[in-house]
Amino acid sequence: MSLGYAEKLSFIEDVGQVGMAEFFDPSHLLQCKIEELAKLIQKSKHLVVFTGAGISTSCGIPDFRGPKGIWTLQREGKDLPKASLPFHRAMPSMTHMALVELERAGILKFVISQNVDGLHLRSGIPREKLSELHGDSFMEMCPSCGAEYLRDFEVETIGLKETSRKCSVEKCGAKLKDTVLDWEDALPPKEIDPAEKHCKKADLVLCLGTSLQITPACNLPLKCLKGGGKIVIVNLQKTPKDKKANVVIHGLVDKVVAGVMESLNMKIPPYVRIDLFQIILTQSISGDQRFINWTLRVASVHGLTSQLPFIKSIEVSFSDNHNYKDAVLDKQPFLMKRRTARNETFDIFFKVNYSDGCDCVSTQLSLPFEFKISTEEHVEIIDKEAVLQSLREKAVEESSCGQSGVVERRVVSEPRSEAVVYATVTSLRTYHSQQSLLANGDLKWKLEGSGTSRKRSRTGKRKSKALAEETKA
């Protein structure tokens, strides 16, 4: 979870048991338990997964209660751990992406998360199949109409407070609120109700990376027992619910999940991170009618005053036959102003330099400049989802990132301006689930942004498809 989130929480003395010892099952026992879990998943008709901070530690996000957890170090009077990358650039783990594949295959029916890192949504779990019990650090919601807004920056507040932005739904415009709970905040019905419903219906609840200490969330998995459901707990520490579980696995979550996917002959899909930004060109005619005064702004799609955390700087240049001064925009807001002859047309070139945490250094773009922008407001119809899917496929095929595409064009009459929204691939991760069970802590898998493996056996594909069809039946 976020260090910023922990610092924003109200102070309480009792945060539960911390500094908990970690246990590792012997390799042969671990393998047996992995195979047992795979069989339970294969037989399951309604699988629910319940996740905690332990599934995100491999993403560079510290947990709370482990030997080096945030609250453990706080209680010991030690410095807090430093995140290995900016919170907003954290990428889904192998476990996150394996859950996506299980959901796509129709095996996983619902995910319940205690985390506020938003990685389940970013990985591709559908919102309607996800309960974020404690909120999402990157989500704002409208208390009036219920609209949700997933941001590419961390929302400033926690505790369901008003933020600085308003709902963009027509005829609404209410002030938005953050979604992250403070200690005394009750679990929202929108999140807890479907979580309870699916736990009661589940024949298998798989708990991943959670110490199962925070109430009332920790009691949700137990609701499957009345209907004959089973519980499996995968965690390095012992939990208060271990005695209720059918299987308890002490091992690295990524390692266990990788082994399960291998046993099921299922591939863990790559993760492609796509970020959006807009280039806005605003024009006005000079008083003597001879020149065009224009302003160029590179802005967030979440609002002109919102930060662009994934962009470090922008280099702007012009066609070779024009002597306009180039510019380097290295402070937000990214803004430049120029004056040109009224009838001139030329190309503007952009080199977008990305911030730390992105897998690509920069992207090159160009935008034609014409002195006349239509006075009629309109939005060009572009199949956004088709563009995004094409970018994902290209990134995986080319084993690289930096691909870009236009997902929206719109013209506004007052002030006269044209906005072009770009989608660009800023990160790529591929996951290889090959295991080595010589020792519990040794998992031979690669997490990379510059390469991917598309190889998959025909036998594996047939088994995976058969498993999905059997589950849906």
Swiss-Prot record:
Residues 453-465 have a biased composition (Basic residues). GO terms for molecular function: chromatin DNA binding; metal ion binding; NAD+ binding; NAD-dependent protein lysine deacetylase activity. The active site is at H134 (proton acceptor). It is an enzyme of class 2 (transferase). Binds 1 zinc ion per subunit. GO terms for biological process: ethylene-activated signaling pathway. NAD-dependent protein deacetylase. Has deacetylase activity towards H3K9Ac. May have a function in the safeguard against genome instability and DNA damage to ensure plant cell growth. Involved in responses to ethylene leading to the transcriptional repression of some ethylene-responsive genes via the regulation of histone acetylation H3K9Ac. Binds to the promoter region of genes influenced by ethylene. Interacts with ENAP1; this interaction is enhanced in the presence of ethylene. This is NAD-dependent protein deacetylase SRT1. It comes from Arabidopsis thaliana (Mouse-ear cress). The lineage of its organism: Eukaryota, Viridiplantae, Streptophyta, Embryophyta, Tracheophyta.
